Amino acid sequence: MFGSRNFGIEDVEECFMKKGYKYTYIDDTSYRDRVNRQIDAKFADSIEKGIEGEKYDCVFTFNYSPVISNNCKKINIPYISFVYDNPQIQLYSYTVINSCNYIFIFDKAQYMELKNGGINTVFYAPLAVNIDRMNRMLGTNGSCNDRYKSDVSFVGSMYNEKHNLFQRLEGVSEYTKGYLDAIIQAQRQVYGLFFLEDLLKDRILDDMLKNYPVEVNTDGVESVEYIYANYFLARELATEERYDIMKKLGTEFGKDYLINLYTPNGSLKIDGVMNKGPIDYYNEMPYVFNNSRINLNITLRSIKSGIPLRACLLYTSPSPRDS
């Protein structure tokens, strides 16, 4: 199993152990690369060593890795990828057609797009939750720490941190700025259909490329329109939408109800809203859900139909404060 200590990997390990699966965990973020000689070497070394005198049956990663897929293809070993992120640009790598692949995607719309395109190595699978861990954590009282109590809560990035990609387009013309703002506002009114990518054409796209050029990978079919729409515009939309929702809640209900925001940008101030700063998704987030009367699920529009992990966790975390 290749990965990095991101949210959820511990749950996968617990699942493997419960099932009696033997595994080796290789912690290396470079497995996310499309090509990486360091990963090639680690892969070959691990496969050669085996595990407790036995050969490996398969290789597993969270999210899809072209470099892992190609290594699995070389030795004809199954590669299982459990995709929990969207956008996931690696899914447009030519390597997805490798016959060794078993790629499980949580966004059914993205799965259908690939499946209808003739990709037979993809499968639909909603995100999983470690219910046993949730039960252990929440116990009988679910932690009554005041840090986690609220009437309304939101956990997630506001996408207004210093690495906001949309701000790097500030050099475009006033016409392009107005156009981009208009299509972002239009997309805010529509759920279930993501059309920003289709609206980036001709002079608008040329202006964006001139001011902040992006390059597509040579080993894939993703377009510059896909990159701009999903990584620039969708996140700017999320910034505006999440801020406006929290601001409206704070203005209308902040005096009478406790409204908490848990986000990496701890300096953000919104009247009527308590910014609690960042929270650990593995060790703390379930307590927030369990101690909130209402938890908001404000989803990135690049997720077309998938149920986000926060919603999956909510299904397993009945609140003691429910009326």
Regions found by a protein language model. Give the residues of each.
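Active-site proximal beta-strand in glycosyltransferases
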Residues: C72-P87, Y102-I105, Y124-L127, S153
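Short, polar loop motifs at secondary-structure junctions
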Residues: N63-V67, P87-Q88, F106-Y111, Y262-L268
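A short, active-site helix/loop in glycosyltransferases that binds the activated sugar's phosphate group
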Residues: I103-N120, D244
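Conserved small/polar residues in nucleotide/adenosyl-binding loops
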Residues: Y315-D322
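Short alpha-helical segment that forms part of, or immediately flanks, the ligand-binding pocket
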Residues: P286, L309-L313
